[in-house]
């Protein structure tokens, strides 16, 4: 399985590249990258600023279809992955739990998507995708759609409800993302 980090966002609300924001003294991208290097045989970073990530010992790719947001990044990560399955996350999630990732990996059977569902809904940027998703993602992009979950009705999906994974991440910290300076300040206070 490949670990894919989507780091192509514009970070407009944050005002600077979210991947390099430090949480507990370590840039978020580094926290994720270190975990993924331990968990996966291949790690890919998808970004529109390849030079910023040149010091990471991973494969770095620009979007194959530029300007399509997370859906375009997901498409790129799955296409270039050497493996049938890819665990894909956003670069602004500083507290991804190893045990939760391992639990999701253990849920892989024959489905094309393995996605957790919290009380806030599906978490498509902390999920596993198969190569079978490539066609539906490309079709969604061509139709002008931007939501990852728009492909879910075209592939087989296994939803992992939070009651099944709360023992691995009781505070749901894996799904915390940092989008604004206010969220970062709040995160640092807690």
What are these regions (language model features)?
Residues 166-190:
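Glycine-rich phosphate/pyrophosphate-binding loop and the adjoining helix
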Residues 1-132, 138-145, 153-172:
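Nucleotide and nucleotide-moiety/phosphate-recognizing core
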């Amino acid at each position: 399985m490949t670990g894919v980090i989507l780091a192509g966002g514009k970070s407009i609300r944050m005002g600077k590249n979210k991947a390099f924001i430090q949480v507990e003294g370590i840039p978020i991208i580094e926290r994720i990258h270190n975990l993924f290097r331990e968990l996966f045989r291949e790690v890919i970073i998808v970004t529109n600023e390849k030079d910023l990530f040149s010091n990471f010992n991973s494969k770095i790719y620009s979007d194959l279809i530029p300007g399509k947001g997370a859906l375009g990044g997901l498409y790129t990560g799955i296409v270039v992955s050497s493996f049938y399955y890819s665990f894909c996350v956003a670069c602004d999630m500083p507290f991804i739990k190893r045990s939760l990732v391992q639990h999701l990996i253990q849920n892989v059977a024959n489905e094309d998507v393995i996605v957790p569902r919290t009380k806030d809904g599906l978490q498509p940027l902390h999920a596993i995708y198969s190569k079978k998703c490539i066609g539906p993602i490309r079709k969604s992009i061509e139709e002008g759609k931007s939501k990852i979950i728009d492909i879910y009705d075209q592939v087989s999906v296994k939803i992992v409800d939070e009651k099944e994974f709360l023992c691995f991440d009781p505070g749901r910290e894996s799904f915390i993302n940092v989008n604004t300076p206010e969220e970062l300040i709040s995160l640092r206070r807690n």
